[in-house]
Protein backbone atom coordinates (compact mmCIF):
# COMPACT_ATOMS: atom_id res chain seq x y z
CA UNK A 1 0.00 0.00 0.00
CA UNK A 2 1.53 3.32 -1.00
CA UNK A 3 1.82 5.99 1.66
CA UNK A 4 0.29 9.23 0.49
CA UNK A 5 2.39 12.38 0.73
CA UNK A 6 1.40 15.87 -0.31
CA UNK A 7 3.83 15.74 -3.25
CA UNK A 8 3.14 17.61 -6.50
CA UNK A 9 2.93 15.22 -9.43
CA UNK A 10 6.10 15.19 -11.52
CA UNK A 11 5.43 15.61 -15.25
CA UNK A 12 7.02 12.49 -16.70
CA UNK A 13 7.91 12.02 -20.40
CA UNK A 14 5.63 10.01 -22.65
CA UNK A 15 6.14 6.27 -22.65
CA UNK A 16 6.16 5.72 -18.89
CA UNK A 17 3.23 4.45 -16.87
CA UNK A 18 4.02 6.29 -13.64
CA UNK A 19 6.56 8.44 -11.87
CA UNK A 20 7.90 5.30 -10.22
CA UNK A 21 8.35 3.66 -13.61
CA UNK A 22 10.30 6.69 -14.82
CA UNK A 23 12.44 6.82 -11.66
CA UNK A 24 13.20 3.11 -12.02
CA UNK A 25 14.28 3.66 -15.63
CA UNK A 26 16.52 6.62 -14.74
CA UNK A 27 18.26 4.86 -11.88
CA UNK A 28 18.77 1.54 -13.66
CA UNK A 29 20.31 3.31 -16.66
CA UNK A 30 22.47 5.43 -14.37
CA UNK A 31 23.66 2.33 -12.52
CA UNK A 32 24.88 0.76 -15.76
CA UNK A 33 26.57 4.00 -16.74
CA UNK A 34 28.23 4.57 -13.36
CA UNK A 35 29.71 1.06 -13.35
CA UNK A 36 30.48 0.96 -17.08
CA UNK A 37 28.03 -1.95 -17.61
CA UNK A 38 29.84 -4.08 -15.00
CA UNK A 39 27.50 -3.64 -12.04
CA UNK A 40 28.41 -5.55 -8.84
CA UNK A 41 25.63 -7.53 -7.20
CA UNK A 42 25.77 -5.39 -4.05
CA UNK A 43 24.80 -2.32 -6.11
CA UNK A 44 21.98 -4.15 -7.92
CA UNK A 45 20.57 -5.42 -4.63
CA UNK A 46 20.93 -2.00 -3.02
CA UNK A 47 19.01 -0.28 -5.81
CA UNK A 48 16.32 -2.96 -5.70
CA UNK A 49 15.87 -2.41 -1.96
CA UNK A 50 15.65 1.37 -2.31
CA UNK A 51 13.18 1.17 -5.18
CA UNK A 52 11.02 -1.15 -3.07
CA UNK A 53 11.04 1.44 -0.29
CA UNK A 54 10.16 4.24 -2.72
CA UNK A 55 7.30 2.22 -4.18
CA UNK A 56 5.89 1.28 -0.79
CA UNK A 57 6.15 4.82 0.57
CA UNK A 58 4.81 6.42 -2.62
CA UNK A 59 7.52 9.08 -2.90
CA UNK A 60 8.91 8.65 -6.44
CA UNK A 61 7.73 12.16 -7.37
CA UNK A 62 9.74 13.56 -4.46
CA UNK A 63 13.05 12.21 -5.79
CA UNK A 64 12.23 13.27 -9.34
CA UNK A 65 11.59 16.85 -8.19
CA UNK A 66 14.96 16.91 -6.44
CA UNK A 67 16.60 15.38 -9.52
CA UNK A 68 15.23 18.18 -11.71
CA UNK A 69 16.03 20.85 -9.14
CA UNK A 70 19.69 19.88 -8.61
CA UNK A 71 20.22 19.22 -12.32
CA UNK A 72 18.94 22.71 -13.15
CA UNK A 73 21.20 24.28 -10.51
CA UNK A 74 24.31 22.58 -11.88
CA UNK A 75 23.41 23.31 -15.50
CA UNK A 76 23.04 26.99 -14.61
CA UNK A 77 26.44 27.34 -13.01
CA UNK A 78 25.44 27.07 -9.37
CA UNK A 79 27.97 25.23 -7.23
CA UNK A 80 26.24 22.47 -5.24
CA UNK A 81 27.88 20.61 -2.37
CA UNK A 82 28.57 16.84 -2.62
CA UNK A 83 25.80 16.19 -0.12
CA UNK A 84 24.65 16.84 3.39
CA UNK A 85 23.77 14.61 6.32
CA UNK A 86 22.36 11.13 5.73
CA UNK A 87 21.11 11.77 2.16
CA UNK A 88 24.55 10.75 0.85
CA UNK A 89 23.78 7.19 1.99
CA UNK A 90 20.94 6.76 -0.51
CA UNK A 91 22.11 5.11 -3.74
CA UNK A 92 19.26 6.66 -5.74
CA UNK A 93 20.49 10.13 -4.77
CA UNK A 94 23.94 9.29 -6.13
CA UNK A 95 22.55 7.82 -9.34
CA UNK A 96 20.42 10.93 -9.94
CA UNK A 97 23.34 13.28 -9.24
CA UNK A 98 21.70 14.75 -6.14
CA UNK A 99 24.71 13.65 -4.07
CA UNK A 100 28.25 12.84 -5.17
CA UNK A 101 29.85 10.11 -3.00
CA UNK A 102 29.10 6.54 -4.00
CA UNK A 103 27.52 5.24 -0.77
CA UNK A 104 28.78 1.71 -1.37
CA UNK A 105 32.40 2.85 -1.61
CA UNK A 106 32.15 4.75 1.67
CA UNK A 107 30.17 2.11 3.63
CA UNK A 108 27.10 4.35 3.91
CA UNK A 109 23.69 2.81 4.51
CA UNK A 110 20.37 3.38 2.76
CA UNK A 111 18.33 2.82 5.90
CA UNK A 112 20.16 5.58 7.78
CA UNK A 113 18.54 7.99 5.31
CA UNK A 114 15.17 6.36 4.66
CA UNK A 115 13.47 3.00 5.16
CA UNK A 116 10.07 1.36 5.23
CA UNK A 117 9.47 2.38 8.84
CA UNK A 118 10.21 6.07 8.24
CA UNK A 119 7.18 8.07 9.32
CA UNK A 120 7.65 11.09 7.08
CA UNK A 121 8.85 12.09 3.66
CA UNK A 122 12.64 12.03 3.14
CA UNK A 123 14.72 15.04 4.11
CA UNK A 124 17.39 16.27 1.68
CA UNK A 125 19.36 19.46 2.26
CA UNK A 126 20.96 21.08 -0.78
CA UNK A 127 23.94 23.32 -0.03
CA UNK A 128 24.74 26.01 -2.58
CA UNK A 129 26.95 29.07 -2.91
CA UNK A 130 25.90 32.40 -1.39
CA UNK A 131 23.20 34.21 -3.33
CA UNK A 132 21.95 31.12 -5.15
CA UNK A 133 18.88 30.50 -3.01
CA UNK A 134 16.96 33.39 -4.59
CA UNK A 135 17.69 32.08 -8.11
CA UNK A 136 16.53 28.61 -7.14
CA UNK A 137 13.30 29.93 -5.62
CA UNK A 138 12.63 31.83 -8.86
CA UNK A 139 13.18 28.58 -10.79
CA UNK A 140 10.64 26.81 -8.58
CA UNK A 141 8.17 29.66 -9.13
CA UNK A 142 8.62 29.26 -12.89
CA UNK A 143 7.86 25.54 -12.60
CA UNK A 144 5.00 25.54 -10.11
CA UNK A 145 3.70 29.12 -10.20
CA UNK A 146 4.27 31.83 -7.61
CA UNK A 147 1.14 30.86 -5.68
CA UNK A 148 2.51 27.35 -5.16
CA UNK A 149 5.95 28.28 -3.82
CA UNK A 150 6.46 29.80 -0.39
CA UNK A 151 8.92 30.03 2.44
CA UNK A 152 8.25 28.41 5.81
CA UNK A 153 7.51 30.43 8.92
CA UNK A 154 9.60 29.85 12.02
CA UNK A 155 8.85 30.67 15.62
CA UNK A 156 11.37 31.83 18.17
CA UNK A 157 10.52 30.88 21.73
CA UNK A 158 11.49 32.69 24.90
CA UNK A 159 14.39 31.03 26.69
CA UNK A 160 15.38 31.44 30.31
CA UNK A 161 17.47 34.60 29.95
CA UNK A 162 15.11 36.28 27.46
CA UNK A 163 12.13 35.52 29.70
CA UNK A 164 13.79 37.18 32.67
CA UNK A 165 14.69 40.25 30.61
CA UNK A 166 11.13 40.61 29.29
CA UNK A 167 9.57 40.01 32.70
CA UNK A 168 11.95 42.58 34.21
CA UNK A 169 10.91 45.22 31.68
CA UNK A 170 7.22 44.50 32.18
CA UNK A 171 7.46 44.69 35.97
CA UNK A 172 9.76 47.70 36.00
CA UNK A 173 12.68 45.92 37.65
CA UNK A 174 15.85 48.06 37.59
CA UNK A 175 18.37 47.05 34.93
CA UNK A 176 21.10 46.28 37.48
CA UNK A 177 18.76 43.83 39.25
CA UNK A 178 17.80 42.24 35.94
CA UNK A 179 21.49 41.70 35.14
CA UNK A 180 21.99 40.02 38.53
CA UNK A 181 19.10 37.65 37.85
CA UNK A 182 20.40 36.60 34.43
CA UNK A 183 23.91 36.02 35.79
CA UNK A 184 22.56 33.32 38.09
CA UNK A 185 21.27 31.22 35.18
CA UNK A 186 23.76 28.34 34.78
CA UNK A 187 25.38 27.56 31.43
CA UNK A 188 24.32 23.92 31.71
CA UNK A 189 22.37 21.59 33.97
CA UNK A 190 23.68 18.07 34.53
CA UNK A 191 21.54 15.40 36.17
CA UNK A 192 22.70 11.95 37.23
CA UNK A 193 20.19 9.13 36.88
CA UNK A 194 22.38 6.30 38.14
CA UNK A 195 24.84 8.19 40.31
CA UNK A 196 27.54 7.78 37.68
CA UNK A 197 26.69 9.27 34.31
CA UNK A 198 25.58 12.89 34.18
CA UNK A 199 23.08 13.78 31.48
CA UNK A 200 22.54 17.35 30.25
CA UNK A 201 19.11 18.92 30.64
CA UNK A 202 17.71 21.91 28.81
CA UNK A 203 18.46 25.10 30.73
CA UNK A 204 15.03 26.38 31.73
CA UNK A 205 13.98 28.31 34.80
CA UNK A 206 11.86 25.38 35.97
CA UNK A 207 14.81 23.00 35.60
CA UNK A 208 17.06 25.49 37.39
CA UNK A 209 14.64 25.63 40.32
CA UNK A 210 14.41 21.85 40.43
CA UNK A 211 17.97 20.69 39.76
CA UNK A 212 20.46 23.57 40.16
CA UNK A 213 21.36 24.02 43.82
CA UNK A 214 22.93 27.48 43.43
CA UNK A 215 19.96 28.90 41.51
CA UNK A 216 17.49 27.35 43.95
CA UNK A 217 19.29 28.95 46.90
CA UNK A 218 19.44 32.28 45.09
CA UNK A 219 15.69 32.12 44.39
CA UNK A 220 14.93 31.38 48.05
CA UNK A 221 16.91 34.48 49.06
CA UNK A 222 14.98 36.71 46.63
CA UNK A 223 12.14 38.86 47.90
CA UNK A 224 9.45 41.07 46.43
CA UNK A 225 9.90 42.23 42.84
CA UNK A 226 12.91 39.99 42.14
CA UNK A 227 11.07 36.84 43.14
CA UNK A 228 7.98 37.94 41.23
CA UNK A 229 10.14 38.51 38.13
CA UNK A 230 11.47 34.94 38.27
CA UNK A 231 7.94 33.58 38.77
CA UNK A 232 6.57 35.53 35.81
CA UNK A 233 9.59 34.59 33.68
CA UNK A 234 9.06 30.88 34.36
CA UNK A 235 5.52 31.20 32.96
CA UNK A 236 6.67 33.31 30.01
CA UNK A 237 9.39 30.80 29.12
CA UNK A 238 8.62 28.65 26.09
CA UNK A 239 6.03 31.08 24.70
CA UNK A 240 6.35 32.35 21.13
CA UNK A 241 8.43 35.50 21.06
CA UNK A 242 9.61 36.03 17.51
CA UNK A 243 8.17 35.18 14.10
CA UNK A 244 10.61 34.77 11.25
CA UNK A 245 11.53 32.67 8.24
CA UNK A 246 13.10 29.24 8.20
CA UNK A 247 16.50 29.83 6.65
CA UNK A 248 16.39 26.95 4.16
CA UNK A 249 12.96 25.32 3.76
CA UNK A 250 10.87 26.07 0.67
CA UNK A 251 7.34 24.68 0.36
CA UNK A 252 6.07 23.57 -3.04
CA UNK A 253 2.51 22.58 -3.91
CA UNK A 254 0.34 22.36 -7.02
CA UNK A 255 -3.29 21.81 -7.99
CA UNK A 256 -2.98 18.09 -7.20
CA UNK A 257 -1.92 18.69 -3.58
CA UNK A 258 -4.31 17.18 -1.05
CA UNK A 259 -3.99 19.99 1.48
CA UNK A 260 -3.79 23.75 1.20
CA UNK A 261 -1.43 25.63 3.47
CA UNK A 262 -2.44 29.00 4.97
CA UNK A 263 0.01 31.71 3.98
CA UNK A 264 0.99 35.20 5.02
CA UNK A 265 3.37 37.97 3.98
CA UNK A 266 6.45 38.43 6.10
CA UNK A 267 9.63 40.48 5.93
CA UNK A 268 12.72 38.59 4.81
CA UNK A 269 15.27 39.94 7.30
CA UNK A 270 18.13 38.40 5.28
CA UNK A 271 17.55 40.94 2.51
CA UNK A 272 18.98 44.43 2.91
CA UNK A 273 15.89 46.02 1.38
CA UNK A 274 13.59 43.99 3.69
CA UNK A 275 11.36 42.75 0.91
CA UNK A 276 8.24 40.89 1.90
CA UNK A 277 7.79 37.30 0.82
CA UNK A 278 5.04 34.72 1.09
CA UNK A 279 5.42 32.16 3.87
CA UNK A 280 3.36 29.20 5.02
CA UNK A 281 1.80 29.76 8.44
CA UNK A 282 2.62 26.16 9.32
CA UNK A 283 6.13 25.80 10.72
CA UNK A 284 8.40 23.04 9.49
CA UNK A 285 7.20 20.46 11.99
CA UNK A 286 3.51 20.91 11.19
CA UNK A 287 4.17 21.14 7.44
CA UNK A 288 5.88 17.75 7.57
CA UNK A 289 2.98 16.25 9.50
CA UNK A 290 0.79 17.02 6.48
CA UNK A 291 3.31 15.43 4.13
CA UNK A 292 4.43 18.70 2.59
CA UNK A 293 7.30 18.72 0.13
CA UNK A 294 9.99 20.97 1.55
CA UNK A 295 13.03 21.63 -0.59
CA UNK A 296 15.86 22.70 1.67
CA UNK A 297 18.37 25.11 0.17
CA UNK A 298 21.22 26.13 2.48
CA UNK A 299 23.67 28.83 1.40
CA UNK A 300 27.23 27.89 2.36
CA UNK A 301 29.96 30.58 2.23
CA UNK A 302 32.60 27.84 1.90
CA UNK A 303 31.17 26.95 -1.51
CA UNK A 304 31.44 30.58 -2.57
CA UNK A 305 35.13 30.56 -1.65
CA UNK A 306 35.68 27.32 -3.54
CA UNK A 307 33.96 28.72 -6.62
CA UNK A 308 36.11 31.84 -6.42
CA UNK A 309 39.25 29.68 -6.22
CA UNK A 310 38.16 27.73 -9.31
CA UNK A 311 37.64 31.02 -11.18
CA UNK A 312 41.07 32.33 -10.13
CA UNK A 313 42.78 29.12 -11.26
CA UNK A 314 41.13 29.43 -14.64
CA UNK A 315 42.02 33.13 -14.90
CA UNK A 316 45.68 32.75 -13.99
CA UNK A 317 46.48 29.23 -15.23
CA UNK A 318 43.88 28.52 -17.89
CA UNK A 319 42.75 25.32 -16.16
CA UNK A 320 39.12 24.19 -15.82
CA UNK A 321 38.91 22.43 -12.46
CA UNK A 322 36.16 19.89 -11.75
CA UNK A 323 36.37 19.49 -7.99
CA UNK A 324 34.32 16.28 -8.09
CA UNK A 325 37.16 14.59 -10.00
CA UNK A 326 40.06 15.58 -7.75
CA UNK A 327 41.72 12.31 -6.56
CA UNK A 328 41.35 11.64 -2.85
CA UNK A 329 44.70 9.83 -2.66
CA UNK A 330 46.77 12.76 -3.92
CA UNK A 331 50.07 12.57 -2.01
CA UNK A 332 50.76 16.31 -1.95
CA UNK A 333 47.31 17.06 -0.54
CA UNK A 334 47.63 14.36 2.13
CA UNK A 335 51.05 15.72 3.08
CA UNK A 336 49.50 19.15 3.65
CA UNK A 337 47.10 17.58 6.14
CA UNK A 338 49.91 15.56 7.75
CA UNK A 339 51.93 18.73 8.23
CA UNK A 340 48.98 20.72 9.55
CA UNK A 341 48.93 23.09 6.58
CA UNK A 342 45.18 23.52 6.77
CA UNK A 343 44.67 27.29 6.92
CA UNK A 344 41.51 28.24 5.06
CA UNK A 345 40.32 24.65 4.63
CA UNK A 346 36.65 24.32 5.66
CA UNK A 347 36.04 22.09 8.70
CA UNK A 348 39.76 21.95 9.60
CA UNK A 349 41.02 25.51 10.06
CA UNK A 350 41.70 25.55 13.81
CA UNK A 351 44.74 25.20 16.04
CA UNK A 352 43.23 22.17 17.78
CA UNK A 353 42.66 20.38 14.47
CA UNK A 354 46.20 21.26 13.36
CA UNK A 355 47.59 19.62 16.50
CA UNK A 356 45.52 16.49 15.93
CA UNK A 357 46.45 16.20 12.26
CA UNK A 358 50.19 16.46 12.89
CA UNK A 359 49.89 13.74 15.54
CA UNK A 360 47.64 11.50 13.45
CA UNK A 361 49.65 11.75 10.20
CA UNK A 362 46.67 10.78 7.98
CA UNK A 363 47.57 8.77 4.90
CA UNK A 364 44.10 8.28 3.44
CA UNK A 365 40.76 10.06 3.09
CA UNK A 366 39.18 7.74 5.68
CA UNK A 367 41.58 9.05 8.36
CA UNK A 368 40.56 12.63 7.62
CA UNK A 369 36.85 11.76 7.67
CA UNK A 370 37.17 9.95 11.00
CA UNK A 371 39.07 12.84 12.58
CA UNK A 372 36.38 15.27 11.40
CA UNK A 373 33.72 13.07 13.03
CA UNK A 374 35.72 12.89 16.26
CA UNK A 375 36.12 16.68 16.31
CA UNK A 376 32.39 17.11 16.75
CA UNK A 377 30.99 18.09 20.18
CA UNK A 378 30.86 15.14 22.57
CA UNK A 379 33.45 13.05 20.73
CA UNK A 380 36.73 14.94 21.17
CA UNK A 381 37.71 12.83 24.18
CA UNK A 382 38.14 9.90 21.75
CA UNK A 383 40.69 11.64 19.50
CA UNK A 384 43.75 10.56 21.49
CA UNK A 385 42.61 6.93 21.44
CA UNK A 386 42.10 7.10 17.67
CA UNK A 387 45.59 8.55 17.14
CA UNK A 388 47.10 5.86 19.36
CA UNK A 389 45.34 3.08 17.48
CA UNK A 390 46.36 4.55 14.12
CA UNK A 391 50.03 4.07 15.05
CA UNK A 392 49.55 0.70 16.78
CA UNK A 393 49.16 -2.23 14.39
CA UNK A 394 48.12 -4.66 17.14
CA UNK A 395 44.41 -3.80 17.19
CA UNK A 396 42.36 -6.80 18.34
CA UNK A 397 38.94 -7.64 16.90
CA UNK A 398 36.26 -9.92 18.29
CA UNK A 399 35.85 -11.67 14.92
CA UNK A 400 36.31 -11.19 11.17
CA UNK A 401 32.92 -9.51 10.78
CA UNK A 402 33.76 -6.71 13.19
CA UNK A 403 37.22 -6.48 11.60
CA UNK A 404 35.62 -5.82 8.20
CA UNK A 405 33.34 -3.15 9.67
CA UNK A 406 35.82 -1.42 11.98
CA UNK A 407 39.23 -1.87 10.33
CA UNK A 408 39.26 1.54 8.62
CA UNK A 409 38.71 3.20 12.02
CA UNK A 410 41.29 0.94 13.70
CA UNK A 411 38.78 -1.04 15.73
CA UNK A 412 36.94 1.99 17.12
CA UNK A 413 33.22 2.52 16.74
CA UNK A 414 32.97 6.08 15.45
CA UNK A 415 29.96 6.05 13.12
CA UNK A 416 26.28 5.25 13.50
CA UNK A 417 26.50 3.20 10.32
CA UNK A 418 29.08 0.91 11.95
CA UNK A 419 26.68 0.03 14.75
CA UNK A 420 23.93 -0.57 12.21
CA UNK A 421 26.21 -2.82 10.13
CA UNK A 422 27.20 -4.84 13.20
CA UNK A 423 23.54 -5.37 14.07
CA UNK A 424 22.79 -6.56 10.54
CA UNK A 425 25.84 -8.70 9.88
CA UNK A 426 26.14 -10.41 13.25
CA UNK A 427 22.55 -10.67 14.51
CA UNK A 428 20.65 -10.38 11.21
CA UNK A 429 18.63 -7.35 12.26
CA UNK A 430 16.57 -5.93 9.41
CA UNK A 431 17.50 -2.52 7.98
CA UNK A 432 14.51 -0.99 9.74
CA UNK A 433 15.43 -2.61 13.06
CA UNK A 434 19.00 -1.31 12.90
CA UNK A 435 17.81 2.26 12.37
CA UNK A 436 15.42 1.88 15.30
CA UNK A 437 18.23 0.69 17.58
CA UNK A 438 20.43 3.52 16.35
CA UNK A 439 17.78 6.00 17.48
CA UNK A 440 17.46 4.26 20.86
CA UNK A 441 21.19 4.64 21.47
CA UNK A 442 20.93 8.32 20.62
CA UNK A 443 18.02 8.80 23.04
CA UNK A 444 19.68 6.66 25.75
CA UNK A 445 16.45 4.70 26.04
CA UNK A 446 17.63 2.16 28.61
CA UNK A 447 14.42 0.17 28.89
CA UNK A 448 13.98 -0.37 25.15
CA UNK A 449 17.72 -0.94 24.68
CA UNK A 450 17.57 -3.74 27.25
CA UNK A 451 15.02 -5.51 25.04
CA UNK A 452 17.20 -5.02 21.96
CA UNK A 453 20.20 -6.31 23.92
CA UNK A 454 18.45 -9.61 24.60
CA UNK A 455 17.38 -9.84 20.97
CA UNK A 456 20.96 -9.21 19.81
CA UNK A 457 22.33 -11.91 22.13
CA UNK A 458 19.74 -14.51 21.09
CA UNK A 459 20.11 -13.86 17.37
CA UNK A 460 23.91 -13.76 17.60
CA UNK A 461 23.98 -17.14 19.29
CA UNK A 462 21.67 -18.47 16.57
CA UNK A 463 24.29 -17.35 14.04
CA UNK A 464 26.93 -19.41 15.85
CA UNK A 465 28.63 -16.76 17.99
CA UNK A 466 29.77 -17.49 21.53
CA UNK A 467 27.82 -15.56 24.16
CA UNK A 468 30.96 -13.90 25.54
CA UNK A 469 31.82 -12.47 22.10
CA UNK A 470 28.28 -11.21 21.55
CA UNK A 471 28.24 -9.58 24.98
CA UNK A 472 31.58 -7.89 24.33
CA UNK A 473 30.34 -6.51 21.01
CA UNK A 474 27.13 -5.17 22.56
CA UNK A 475 29.09 -3.60 25.43
CA UNK A 476 31.31 -1.80 22.91
CA UNK A 477 28.26 -0.51 21.01
CA UNK A 478 26.56 0.58 24.22
CA UNK A 479 29.70 2.40 25.36
CA UNK A 480 30.00 4.43 22.15
CA UNK A 481 26.39 4.41 20.95
CA UNK A 482 25.47 7.81 22.38
CA UNK A 483 28.52 9.51 20.87
CA UNK A 484 28.78 8.07 17.36
CA UNK A 485 28.41 10.35 14.35
CA UNK A 486 26.64 9.99 11.00
CA UNK A 487 29.25 8.72 8.54
CA UNK A 488 27.35 10.04 5.52
CA UNK A 489 27.48 13.53 7.02
CA UNK A 490 31.22 13.26 7.73
CA UNK A 491 32.03 12.03 4.22
CA UNK A 492 29.95 14.78 2.59
CA UNK A 493 31.54 17.54 4.65
CA UNK A 494 35.08 16.30 4.03
CA UNK A 495 34.44 16.15 0.28
CA UNK A 496 33.35 19.81 0.27
Identify the residue ranges that each predicted region occupies:
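Alpha-helical scaffold/interaction cores of sigma-54-like transcription cofactors
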Residues: 1-496
Amino acid sequence: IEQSFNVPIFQIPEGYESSFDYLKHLTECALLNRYDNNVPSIATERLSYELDVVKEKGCADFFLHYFEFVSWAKENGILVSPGRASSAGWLINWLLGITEPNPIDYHLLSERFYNKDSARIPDIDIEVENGAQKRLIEHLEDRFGKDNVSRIISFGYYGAETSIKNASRALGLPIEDMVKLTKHIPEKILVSEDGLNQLPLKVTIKNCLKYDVDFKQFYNRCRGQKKQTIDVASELEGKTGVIGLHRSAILITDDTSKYSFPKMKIYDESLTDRLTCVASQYDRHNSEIYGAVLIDVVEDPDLSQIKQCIALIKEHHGLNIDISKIPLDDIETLNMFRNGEIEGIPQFDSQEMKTWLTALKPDCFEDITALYALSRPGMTDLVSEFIRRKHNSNTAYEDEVTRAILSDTYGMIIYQEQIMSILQDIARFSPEETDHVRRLFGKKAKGELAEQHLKFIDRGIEQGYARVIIENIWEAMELKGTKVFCRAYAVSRCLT
